[in-house]
């Protein structure tokens, strides 16, 4: 499986004792990953895919795999079959997905995930927001991302992204769903990214 780690996240590792460091274990490959037994699609995502990149497993939620890329490939990821490897399962037609959601009034929210949703360009993020914010029966739009944890400056140093989120959350409530796995990830930079999101109404 591929390895990609941001310089920022590497800086959180205690290099005097790396093999016992929780951040190290989340980002540096282990020999245990060579055990390929088991199922690569542990949550049955293939069975719930209705359009390339769009899953509809739960009545009220549509899940979009917006990209196969991440800023860091977490060693515990349950989508190892695709992240950093293949875009075969990711979205390639935003308009088609929006049309599907429009035709299914039971869907009250979408989760734009990946890969990492915030590794998309601002232009792509805007296209998602444009398409889905106009659907009346959607209550909210969620973005699944580890960017606040592994590359927080992507958020707090990007006024264009923050302005985009601030504008569209006034049309349709936006949530950012992230994942802090250890207290060592709760840095000043991460807090700054979270505060920037909160200050933008997210």
Explain the meaning of each model-derived region.
Residues 46, 58, 89-93, 157, ...:
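Short secondary-structure boundary/capping elements
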Residues 68, 78, 114, 145-147, ...:
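Short, structured patches in soluble enzyme cores that scaffold and shape functional sites
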Residues 64-65, 76-77, 109-118, 132:
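Conserved catalytic-core segments centered on acid/base and nucleophilic motifs
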Residues 95-109, 118-202:
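Conserved AdoMet/S-adenosylmethionine-binding subsite of the radical SAM
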Residues 1-57:
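Flexible, acidic/Gly-rich N-terminal and inter-domain linker regions that tether
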Residues 25, 66, 85:
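A conserved cap/lid and substrate-binding interface adjacent to the catalytic center
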Residues 2, 47-78:
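N-terminal pre-triad scaffold of radical SAM enzymes
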């Amino acid at each position: 499986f591929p390895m990609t780690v941001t310089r920022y996240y590497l800086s959180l590792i205690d290099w005097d004792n790396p093999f016992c460091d929780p951040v190290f274990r989340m980002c540096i490959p282990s020999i245990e990953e060579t055990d390929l037994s088991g199922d690569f699609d542990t949550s049955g995502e293939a069975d719930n895919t209705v359009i390339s990149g769009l899953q509809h497993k739960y009545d009220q939620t549509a899940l979009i795999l917006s990209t196969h890329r991440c800023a860091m490939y977490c060693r515990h990821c349950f989508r190892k079959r695709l992240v950093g490897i293949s875009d075969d399962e990711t979205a390639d037609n935003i308009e088609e997905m929006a049309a599907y959601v429009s035709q299914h009034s039971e869907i009250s929210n979408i989760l734009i995930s990946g890969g990492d949703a915030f590794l998309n360009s601002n232009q792509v993020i805007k296209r998602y927001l444009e398409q889905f914010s106009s659907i009346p029966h959607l209550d909210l739009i969620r973005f699944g991302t580890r960017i606040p944890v592994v590359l927080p400056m992507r958020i707090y140093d990007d006024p264009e992204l923050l302005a985009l989120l601030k504008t569209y959350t006034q049309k349709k409530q936006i949530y950012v769903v992230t994942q802090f796995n250890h207290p060592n990830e709760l840095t000043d930079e991460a807090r700054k990214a979270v505060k920037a999101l909160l200050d933008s109404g997210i």
